[in-house]
Curated annotation (Swiss-Prot):
Catalyzes the formation of cytosolic acetyl-CoA, which is mainly used for the biosynthesis of fatty acids and sterols. Keywords: ATP-binding, Cytoplasm, Lipid biosynthesis, Lipid metabolism, Magnesium, Metal-binding, Nucleotide-binding, Phosphoprotein, Transferase. GO terms for molecular function: ATP binding; ATP citrate synthase activity; metal ion binding. Mg(2+) binds at E274. GO terms for cellular component: cytosol. Its EC number is 2.3.3.8. This is Probable ATP-citrate synthase subunit 1.
Amino acid sequence: MPSATTASTNGANGASASPAPGNLSANDNIRRFAAPSRPLSPLPAHALFNDKTRCFVYGLQPRAVQGMLDFDFICKRSTPSVAGIIYTFGGQFVSKMYWGTSETLLPVYQEVPKAIAKHPDVDVVVNFASSRSVYSSTMELMEYPQIKTIAIIAEGVPERRAREIAYVAKKKGITIIGPATVGGIKPGCFKIGNTGGMMDNIVASKLYRKGSVGYVSKSGGMSNELNNIISQTTDGVYEGVAIGGDRYPGTTFIDHLLRYQADPDCKILVLLGEVGGVEEYKVIDAVKQGIITKPIVAWAIGTCASMFKTEVQFGHAGAFANSQLETAATKNKSMREAGFYVPDTFEDMPALLKQVYDKLVADGTIVPAPEPVVPKIPIDYSWAQELGLIRKPAAFISTISDDRGQELLYAGMPISDVFKEEIGIGGVMSLLWFRRRLPDYAAKFLEMVLMLTADHGPAVSGAMNTIITTRAGKDLISSLVAGLLTIGSRFGGALDGAAEEFTKAFDKGLSPREFVDTMRKQNKLIPGIGHRVKSRNNPDLRVELVKEYVKAKFPSTKLLDYALAVESVTTSKKDNLILNVDGCIAVCFVDLLRNCGAFSTEEAEDYLSMGVLNGLFVLGRSIGLIAHYLDQKRLRTGLYRHPWDDITYLLPSLQQPGPPGTEGRVEVQI
């Protein structure tokens, strides 16, 4: 049997001794379990599970697996019941699960043969494969002699396939639980998948220790109700199986009740049948023949079917009476006549079960065991938070979008309204960047900026970097980033600086001449002033477009007017010291923030200090950089190498030998 590899243990379940606080590492909270040295001893013929049962879970079902491990932990098993996961759609990896409050790693296998070879102690498979693939996966699993029990969870398995599975399983001596089942449970030992519900329900139903009552039902949901009834009226469940609601289950009532009959620890049998099928009559025959002698408390659900004028299909595929013999009323009558304990209604079942239990306790057949200490339930953090038991500060805060509901929200605006109201890219930017709707002219201005800054030809540094990177064979993201990384104070990034300097001078009340003189005395260039190509006589049409729009639409253009006055001063000195597109956009954006009515003075200053203006240039220029990438790819251009004649080489030369102490000096000759 595999065992935990921790060297020293204390407490329940062999919990690892706490390491010294100064020696903690990321792996100190992970429990590891050694592989088994040999297969387990075979179980008695009547037993499917014990406290050493190990299984595979077929399919990626982390919640079900975690529920099984939590059950193992509170039952004080020494090892997890799940040895590994078989998931055919991914490579081999490990899945991290909780073992109590620690963590453990479960192997995930892509192929059944590898899983079987690694775990000779596994004899149970919980098959979560879909109805389309469950047939092939189950048939494959049954090829391995070590597999003795398979639970098929899927609903909708074709009846012919279900009958084939049952036939092959019977021939090979394999027990099939399902299809269309929640599974089964053996308290204190093993549970299949999601059987028993959540951990608080399992503890409330006392499924962490064995009782004396074995039940079998068709319905998985009703098996949960039986767990509750049995825990309140007796010493608890010994074993419970839901055979599934399909018409052709792999095993039937009689198969499991015969196992319970052969098990000396199971004292009372409970049968919960339903309308449809004739499996209850096999149990009746076994009782009449004396094969089953233990008391059976039984009920067939669906007595209300007689109230309808026509036959009614209930929830399960097999819950349909094709004859009078298959009706719930006839079944209950036949079971009562055969000596079963059958209540008048399902509501009377708990009282009748308690009556039978008390009788067996009185005659000494059942000796109630002392009630053990109720185990502590490990609670997932998310579940505890949902119940309001704990609180924790969030690691991140987002105030711009929310994808948790049925519809994506941009700053509280549903995405459907974004399209319905046709707010455009500028409107979306206003919602996500500024968390509010800006006036239409402001949204239009944002779009205008993106269009004007989208590209400025292949010669600028950003485009050149993108082109060279693309021609080196790099991908789109790498080529785009190569161009974006050139954006700064010298290329494209003058917007924030221009906004800061012009705003500071304007707010101080400096005249345009005083502003220019102040910057000259500080030996600073004025951001947003000057162009390498354009001049007063050869104006930048982009600037003209911005000025024309802003003058026509903005309620106030005080800072733009101030910048144009500064331009008059600078161009009197040199013709190309014009207000360039960066400077024009910057001062107009400040006018927008201050005068559109959507921002307070403090908010306007905050957004400027955040670098929102450079964000406009980055967003706009990304369009052009991607265009240059696509252009070079489309042209199938090769690796770029710069020509030698465009490079001036100035290499150092070593000085001729001279006086001692001058060795190794380097002179640069120009």
